[in-house]
Amino acid sequence: MIKLVLLRHGESQWNLENRFTGWHDIDLTDNGRIEASNAGRAIKEAGLTFDIAYTSVLKRAIRTLWNALDVLDLMWIPVVKSWRLNERHYGALQGLNKSETSRKYGEEQVLVWRRSYDTPPPVLDKDDERYPGTDRRYAELGEAEIPLSECLKDTVERFLPIWRDTIEPEIRKGRKVLIVAHGNSLRALVKYLDNISEEDIVGLNIPTGIPLVYELDDDLKPLKSYYLGDQEAIKQAVQAVAGQAKA
């Protein structure tokens, strides 16, 4: 049986402040670092190990991976960083407080922007200081690849190439894979793996710092999936994510 482990980064400073983060490169809080280390312990207690890891080019995910691998004594394994695993780009919402945005635009509209499949938030202007096209880490991307805003559909479309061309072949070789990424890039992968409908994906929330294990068959089709840790605490963490945009 194949086991794939997914992990959303630990709590970031903007998670704590309940702000739309997107591609902004904010770091973990002290609690987020603890979450990352605890994730490593949960993985270790489950008897899981890895041959290779994948993460984004954003420090909250990279540092989460470092902390987890440190606990696992696996800091030596290859790590592939890719912009394709970045959080979805929240466009002009990036940096705004979610509750304040809900009070301004209404909870229903903000839920559509946060969780719908094909409705992106308002776009950034290219002269906005938040535009990622001036960031060195994206220097090799074509202008069309640099988002001004993204819906989940856009995130799926940029994530799947690295899954199909890079990660999936490694799994088929028998390598044990860990993916540390973000709420929406992981939602994109979960939607693909579980074949979740565009309507049902609205209700999927992934908490910070809790390992999600997928057991896959030889065709990489899910047999089952489950979070590692105290199930009641995990349920509360999922509910907390769902309630972030309440006015």
Swiss-Prot record:
Record has Cell membrane as a keyword: no
Keyword terms, alphabetized: Gluconeogenesis, Glycolysis, Isomerase
InterPro entries for the chain: His_Pase_superF_clade-1, His_PPase_superfam, PG/BPGM_mutase_AS, Phosphogly_mut1
EC number: 5.4.2.11
Positions bound to substrate: 8-15, 21-22, 60, 87-90, 98, 114-115, 183-184
UniProt-listed Pfam families: His_Phos_1 (PF00300)
GO BP field: gluconeogenesis; glycolytic process
Record has Isomerase as a keyword: yes
Top EC class of this enzyme: isomerase
Catalyzed reactions: (2R)-2-phosphoglycerate = (2R)-3-phosphoglycerate
Transition state stabilizer (site feature) positions: 182
Pathway: Carbohydrate degradation; glycolysis; pyruvate from D-glyceraldehyde 3-phosphate: step 3/5
One term of GO molecular function: phosphoglycerate mutase activity
Active site per database record: 9 (tele-phosphohistidine intermediate), 87 (proton donor/acceptor)
Family classification: Belongs to the phosphoglycerate mutase family. BPG-dependent PGAM subfamily.
NCBIfam families reported in the protein's UniProt record: pgm_1, PRK14115.1
PANTHER family in the record: PHOSPHOGLYCERATE MUTASE
Role played: Catalyzes the interconversion of 2-phosphoglycerate and 3-phosphoglycerate.
Name used for this protein in its record: 2,3-bisphosphoglycerate-dependent phosphoglycerate mutase
Organism: Chlorobium limicola (strain DSM 245 / NBRC 103803 / 6330)
Gene giving rise to this polypeptide: gpmA
